[in-house]
Swiss-Prot record:
Protein name in UniProt: Ubiquinone biosynthesis protein COQ4 homolog, mitochondrial
Keywords noted in UniProt: Lyase, Membrane, Metal-binding, Mitochondrion, Mitochondrion inner membrane, Ubiquinone biosynthesis, Zinc
One annotated GO biological process: ubiquinone biosynthetic process
Annotated EC: 4.1.1.130
Length: 268
């Protein structure tokens, strides 16, 4: 079977996992046969992913953005929007992961965050000023569970699919380290931090359109306190995706915030 040839800049071709060869004096990228999956996540994902054409991707992206705008409670549409618009940002995140020793370990291990993989009984025994204890307290105070995240289905590259999965499963951990609740104000503020930190379009959309739904009193607090704080932390903080949160349970949460360049908003 003939391989499809693509005339792409060499760095972009290599970034997308293509082979680069010289043809008539020009660098040409050729699609290689799909490599054998290297781990359980990739094997499972390749069984369950839904393959879509470029046209379907555009159609799904447009449709899900309209549906999410009309009804922000449609988490399925928000998830679809993230997958159909986030590939370029995910490629940049992948570069960031590969440039960090901690990020490389995450990509090698591909840890998952739900009740079947995290020892929450152990976290409950940790001192209250540790990250693990703060995470458990966040889950209880906000009555949320790590098992509620939707599975990724529409991304072609399993590595990018894992990064989107990782982003979703770490969302509550970002809430924890930012000390933000899951109410509308907290969600919009966290989305701004995530948008500036990851570059994911869906985060920008959630931040902008989520703010529209704030009530007048909330909007005043948002503009005066939450938005300036979120923008400052989003721009100043270190990349959060390469943080191996599961290795930080015992770390003092104040030291962790200092390491990541995060400050907590004084809500008084």
């Amino acid at each position: 079977m003939m391989q499809r040839c693509l005339r792409l800049p060499k760095p972009l071709a290599l970034r997308r996992g293509l082979h680069v060869a010289q043809v008539n004096g020009q660098a040409v990228a050729t699609e290689a046969p799909e490599a054998e999956p290297q781990d359980a996540f990739e094997r499972q994902y390749l069984k369950e992913r839904i393959e879509i054409s470029p046209f379907q991707r555009v159609f799904l992206g447009a449709g899900s953005s309209i549906a999410a705008l009309l009804d922000p409670r449609r988490h399925d549409m928000i998830a679809c929007l993230g997958e159909t618009t986030g590939e370029d940002a995910l490629l940049t995140i992948l570069d960031t992961m590969q440039a960090s020793e901690e990020g490389q370990r995450i990509m090698a291990d591909k840890p998952r965050i739900h009740t079947s993989t995290i020892d929450f009984k152990y976290l409950e025994t940790l001192p209250p000023d540790t990250f693990g204890a703060a995470y458990v307290k966040f889950l209880k105070d906000n009555q949320v569970t790590p098992d509620s995240r939707m599975a990724v289905r529409f991304l072609e590259d399993p590595k990018l699919a894992y990064l989107m999965t990782r982003y979703r499963e770490c969302h509550d951990l970002i809430h924890t380290v930012l000390d933000m609740p899951t109410n509308m104000l907290g969600e919009v503020a966290v989305k701004w931090v995530e948008a500036l930190n990851t570059g994911l379009p869906m985060c920008y959309g959630g931040a902008v359109f989520g703010a529209v739904r704030l009530r007048p009193k909330q909007r005043r607090a948002y503009l005066k306190h939450y938005l300036p704080w979120a923008l400052e932390n989003g721009k100043r903080s270190k990349p959060l995706m390469p943080v191996y949160w599961e290795k930080r349970w015992e770390q003092n949460i104040h030291e962790l915030r200092s390491e990541l360049g995060i400050t907590v908003l004084n809500k008084a």
